[in-house]
């Protein structure tokens, strides 16, 4: 049986989910497939045959660090892999990165739109350097965001700048490299040793384009991700299986690459 690891999901404490999901639905004019609760994600995983999910939290203000870290500790298990978050404007951001590693987590999630930064600005580089030094994986929202004005704060050129400046950083460019900037992903990123997750992208791309993009990229640097609850995990698996990839490549994307990456961050 193929190991499946969803490297890009979201969930919230129950009381937060009840507020957050309707607000996010309104901002992005999208409908969630789940209610944002952890129990619903696990039920979805069971239905889709997904063994593990990475939960990507986002600290939208410095004061959220402690509560996100605490909740992440509470929910982690052999199937749930939380990636906590810190806010770059926190006065002790460097110490918070160290605390995430000290608590035993494998990675961190950041989001330029929700956290008010440009991907390659100078103030971010010491933070990325610390993340790299701690051996943490950095899952970064890249490309535009459906809920925000289309400002170019996380485009492929900026991704490449970060990778060049911090060469040891385990950086995952989400949404197939950069959401809704896929022509630039093709031009600038494909073929380079940069991790791409496939979240919230396959249903928006023509099948042949998605297949060609996957085949143009190093097969060890592709990760399955759904962006649940904003897509159905089962539907994204079906979309991937419909691309006609080899069984060996599909196994790497579904879980083999993720398992190797996570093992290296333990």
Predicted regions and their residues:
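Acidic (Asp/Glu)-rich catalytic clusters
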Residues: 42-49, 69-81, 95-104, 125-133, ...
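N-terminal/domain-start segments enriched in small and hydrophobic, helix-friendly residues
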Residues: 46, 50-51, 124-147, 190-193, ...
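Hydrophobic faces of well-ordered beta-strands that scaffold small-molecule active sites
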Residues: 5-9, 53-55, 81-85, 106-110, ...
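Mid-to-C-terminal alpha-helical segments outside catalytic/metal-binding sites
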Residues: 2-10, 17-52, 216-221, 234-266
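Divalent metal-binding pocket/active-site signature
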Residues: 34-35, 59-63, 88-91, 102-186
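Short, well-structured secondary-structure segments
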Residues: 49-64, 71, 77-85, 109
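H/E-rich (His + Asp/Glu) clusters that bind or coordinate divalent metals
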Residues: 176-266
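Conserved, mostly hydrophobic/aromatic
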Residues: 8, 45, 72, 100, ...
């Amino acid at each position: 049986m193929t190991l499946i690891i969803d490297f890009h999901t979201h969930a919230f404490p129950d009381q937060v989910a009840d507020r957050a999901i309707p607000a996010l639905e309104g901002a992005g004019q999208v409908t969630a497939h789940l209610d944002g609760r952890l129990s619903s994600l696990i039920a979805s995983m069971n239905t889709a045959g997904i063994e593990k999910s990475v939960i990507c939290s986002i600290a939208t203000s410095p004061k959220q660090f402690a509560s996100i870290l605490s909740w992440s500790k509470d929910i982690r298990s052999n199937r749930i892999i939380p990636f906590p978050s810190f806010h770059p404007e926190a006065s002790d951001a460097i110490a918070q990165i160290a605390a995430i590693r000290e608590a035993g987590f494998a990675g961190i999630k950041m989001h330029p739109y929700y956290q008010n930064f440009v991907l390659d600005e100078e103030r971010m580089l010491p933070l990325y350097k610390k993340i790299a030094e701690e051996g943490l994986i950095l899952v970064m929202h890249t490309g535009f965001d459906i809920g925000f004005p289309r400002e170019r704060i996380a485009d492929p050129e900026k991704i490449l700048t970060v990778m060049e400046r911090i060469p040891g950083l385990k950086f995952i460019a989400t949404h197939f490299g950069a959401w809704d900037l896929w022509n630039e992903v093709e031009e600038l990123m494909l073929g380079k040793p940069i991790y791409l997750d496939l979240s919230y992208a396959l249903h928006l791309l023509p099948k042949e384009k998605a297949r060609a993009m996957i085949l143009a990229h190093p097969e060890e640097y592709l990760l399955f991700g759904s962006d649940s609850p904003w897509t159905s995990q089962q539907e994204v698996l079906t979309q991937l299986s419909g691309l006609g990839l080899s069984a060996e490549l599909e196994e790497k994307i579904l879980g083999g690459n993720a398992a190797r990456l996570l093992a290296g961050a333990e």
